[in-house]
Amino acid sequence: MSLCLGHIFSRSRSPLTPERRESLRRLQETLGVKFRDPTALDQALSHRSLFSSKEDHCGVRHNERMEFLGDAVLGAVAAACLYRALPDSHEGDLAKTKAVLVSTDTLSDIALSLRIDHYLLLGKGEELSGGRHKKAILADATEAVIGALFLDSGFKAAERFVLRLLLPRVRPIREKNLHHDYKSTLQVLAHQRYRSKPEYTVVKRTGPDHSVRFWVDVTVGDARFGPGYGTSKKSAEQCAARLAWEQLSGTLRE
C-alpha cells in the first residue's frame, strides 16, 4: 500500500523542469519501476551538498532521510531473501552473507549497473571532488531510491525491486567464499557501524622460528578483541577478526 506522500514532495521541492522529468523517465525505464510521483525519485538522487544548511536545515530536500528508510527496507528484504534461499545455513552464516550483500561495495556496483551515477544531483564542490564516483555516495543513493520507491508505491513494489537486484548476487557471493573471509566481513561491519577500519596488533609471538605462533588483537572503534592466534600473522588476524565479528554481530556461541 502506498503511503501517498506525493503532496509532501510537491510542497517541499520546486517543480521538475521538463528536462529533468524526461531524465527521470529514462532512469525509471532502466530501474524497471514507475513512480507515481517522480519528485520522490528526484529527491532520492539529491545529495546533501546540493543545499546549504540554511536551505535544508530539517533535511527535507536532500536524500538522507530516504536513505535511512531504504536501508531498513533493504535489510528486511535481504534477510528474508537469504532465509528462504539458504535453508541449510545457520544464523551466523546468513548474517555474514547479508553483510556482504548489502555492503557499500555491492550497493555502489548496483548503482553503476543502473547508471544512477548519471542522474545524481550534487553540489559544485562535491562534483569537483569526484563525488559522482564515490562508493559511499553511490551506495547511499541506491538505498535512497529504495526508500523513495517504498514511500511512493509501497512495500511490495520496493521488495520486488530489491529482490531483482539481490537474487542474482547471492550465488556469486557464496561461491567466492566472501562470507568466510572474516577480515573482509569485519571491515564491512566496521565501516557500516563506526565508519572506520579494524586495526590489527601483534601482541605476542611464541615458539622457535620453525614453529612460531602469533597472537593478534584487533581494535574496532573503541573496543579491542582477541587475541586470535595462528602459525602466521595472516591466520592470527583472521582468527582475531572472527572473534570480533562474532561478538559485534551477536552470534557468539556458548
UniProtKB/Swiss-Prot annotation:
Entry-linked InterPro entries: dsRBD_dom (IPR014720), RNase_III (IPR011907), RNase_III_dom (IPR000999), RNase_III_sf (IPR036389)
All copies of domain DRBM, residue ranges: 181-250
Catalytic activities: Endonucleolytic cleavage to 5'-phosphomonoester
Chain ranges passing through the membrane: none
One Gene Ontology term of the molecular function aspect: double-stranded RNA binding
The RNase III domain, residue ranges: 24-154
Residues bound to Mg(2+): E67, D140, E143
Listed cofactors: Mg(2+)
Pfam families: dsrm, Ribonucleas_3_3
Enzyme class: hydrolase
Compartment(s): Cytoplasm
Cellular component terms (Gene Ontology): cytoplasm
Keywords: Cytoplasm, Endonuclease, Hydrolase, Magnesium, Metal-binding, mRNA processing, Nuclease, RNA-binding, rRNA processing, rRNA-binding, tRNA processing
GO biological process terms, semicolon-separated: mRNA processing; regulation of gene expression; rRNA processing; tRNA processing
Enzyme Commission number, as recorded: 3.1.26.3
Catalytic residues as annotated in Swiss-Prot or TrEMBL: D71, E143
Subunit structure: Homodimer.
Function: Digests double-stranded RNA. Involved in the processing of primary rRNA transcript to yield the immediate precursors to the large and small rRNAs (23S and 16S). Processes some mRNAs, and tRNAs when they are encoded in the rRNA operon. Processes pre-crRNA and tracrRNA of type II CRISPR loci if present in the organism.
Family: Belongs to the ribonuclease III family.
Alphabetical list of PANTHER family matching this protein: RIBONUCLEASE 3, RIBONUCLEASE III
Protein's recorded name: Ribonuclease 3
